[in-house]
Amino acid sequence: MPYVFDERIGRRRFIKTVGTAAAGAGALGALSGCTSKIGAYAHPIAPNPDGLKQWGREAGQWIPSCCNMCGGQSGILCHVVNGVVEKIEPNHWNPNNYSNISSDFFAGYTEEFGCAEGGAICPKGNAGIMQLYDPDRLKTPLKRANPDKSPGADPRWQEISWDQALDEIAAKLRALRDSGEAHKLLWMSEDHSFTHIQADFCKLFGTPNYSMHSNLCDVARKASFTTVMGESRPLADFIQSKYILLFGWNPTSAIKWVYLPRILTRAVERGARLVVVDPYLSDTAAKAHEWVAIRPGTDGALALALAHVIIRDQLYDQPFVEKWTVGFEEYAAYVKDKTPQWAGQITGIPAAKIERLAREFATTKPACVDAWSGPGHHSNGVQAGRAIALLAALVGGYDRPGTLMIPDTRGNTHIELEPDATAAVTLKQPRFDELERYPLGHKSGVYCQMFANLAEGKGPYTPKMLVCVFQNPMMSVPGTDTVAKALARLETLVVIDTMMSETAQLADYVLPGTNYLERYDLTTHWVTWPVVGLRQPVVKPLFGQPAEYETIAALGRRLGLKTGEGVEFFRVGPLSGRPIENLTEWYEDMLSKELKAGAPGITLAELKELPGAVWVDKKGTRYEKFAEEIPAAKLATCVYDGDPKTDGTGIYDKPKALGGKRVGTVIGGKPVRGFFTPSGRIEFSARWLATKKDAHGKPVDPLPAYTPRDWQPTPEFPLYLINWKEASHTQTRTQNNVWLLDLKPDNPLVMHPDTAARLGLAAGDEVWVESPYGKTKAKLKTSKRMHPEVVGLQHGFGHTALGRTARGRGTSDSSLRPTKACALSGQALHKEACVRVYKAVQT
């Protein structure tokens, strides 16, 4: 009799595993192999027909892959029995499960057993089985029969064949392209899955409007660090640090990468002091030596006051500042009056505490400071992030052990395509989201501007069609009513997803997507040296549906999209150069092309044969890369933008006029890597910003100036509203996963008990939460973990669709916020709202 997955048995096993982990590592930390008493023993990935219990594994087939329950891309091993995924465990050969520093990962590593302690995955990774076998998954293409696209209207879905769906969608796309309106196609993509082929499709089709999820996530942080030190995502070397200062980041629960809880807790165990600045006592703050409760949106003021003390008392790293930075004098003059007393009035933090924190941070070596969405999701978030990033510069805290590391994420290489003449014409059209107005904008676009323009009938033209891949803007973009109004203005909305999301409910066509356990991807992991992991199908698509990249390629074939050289891209293997009929084989050829062109230099088949199906550069982490001299052979092909003997002269791979990329700078008379900023150094003052204006037309300050955020409490709306994420769920995606709902079934509104008492409220009350933009109900939870001036919700709940289990659980915060973006970066402002809270009257 064939094996059939039993969800009830699986749930008991999952809860038992999580419970075991919680006893030793905190309720929602990462789950390590040692939780099942496997410890450092081997985890063979070959089929195990005899059931070698000494390795802690059942009989069956173990297939390595990479998780996609969130953007962390952890390595996983999947136990497959008769074509059914029965269990998911960590992949001990993948650094992304263990550490971002090579010396830590390789200590005790063997190709036979992997890393010494065993890797980890989080609760979501374990629950990936239920994401695959969710009974509410979409199974067949659907076409809308009801022209009414308002929320709550019955779409009157008609089931159609895949051929009909693709033919009709291709016909609508062809009509746009043939009429010279290819730019009126909008495209939204999740940014960790098959993004290259989507970008290729949009380019060959002729639309400049390819956008990704990142502008909902961390583009403010990327803008801050890129402006300061030329890298969008420096990585914290916690495990070697002695002082860790975090602004608005919860890495032990809101796990961006599953190695974070391990390296942070190991650092604390080894004597590091941990300080967390946050309005909410997060799980990380609860484990810290000190929680600094701050008013939302005032992180920049605190950072400037810390800098004031460090400079005033001459505690900064003078040799580093003199050699590797510019603009220090301007910056020092700016912070001269940014005293702890000044910041104390703004942040609510006592001046004496600010003085002490500054001295601790500057005198404890090595020190690491970092910030994520806490500061970044406010309208002043980019400048706050710059002020925080410059604290690291003051103490020489970049690319040295125990500091913020310059990542070396060389992996597979995306081969840029040249469009044909037809596409080239419409690609010259401006982006509909007006990205060019955002001086520190990101290639992912500006979702908020896009939806606001569409809803209000503004923008450079009127889009006609949107393809939305694994995105649910009705839940994830601030301003639900604005998003709904915008979507209703489209002639055609196509959604590709595994679930009937709130956005899919408004679509004209819904195509079933694949779960990550059914498809391919290459994942260039976010560690400090080059690593590429493989996501590969461990089971066949449950409903016979094509993977998303196959759907896109099938549309490309129907449209006959060609490159500028006349090659029909989606029919000819990018590596082999020969026609490939099978869509899966064509995509495998594309992945091999990217691997061969990138750091691994191997094919997909060769990657599959490596331990854990992960390529790891054995050279490991390099420190002080900014001081590395450019090799003579490379320098011979480069060009200088000035005198090669003059400090500050830039070195480019080709002339700047031809789009040359900066690869180095002359510093100390030597051609070194430096920092990839306009000056080649860390920039306390980004002087090039002085000529820029933000999206509102306001001049941009070259210094990390503090200004209050746009939305402030008023007598009518007196409370700040914040949100956060936890390891129990992924954004708005997992609330139909019954295993994860066993851990976190809803999201009550958290309020300080003193605030509740003042408002005549009590724990358990049903309350209204109202802002100038919307109103919603919530269940009240009182806790001293919340700042008295603030209320907050875990983001992701409050679904009206997605599935039978998700619907009606908890509260969505998106309806309470304006559809506004940071005027510098385009970051969605998920924390920019103030509310009033009052008891819901029972009727």
Listing of model-derived features with the role each one plays in the protein:
Residues L306, V326-Y447:
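Active-site phosphate/pyrophosphate-binding segments
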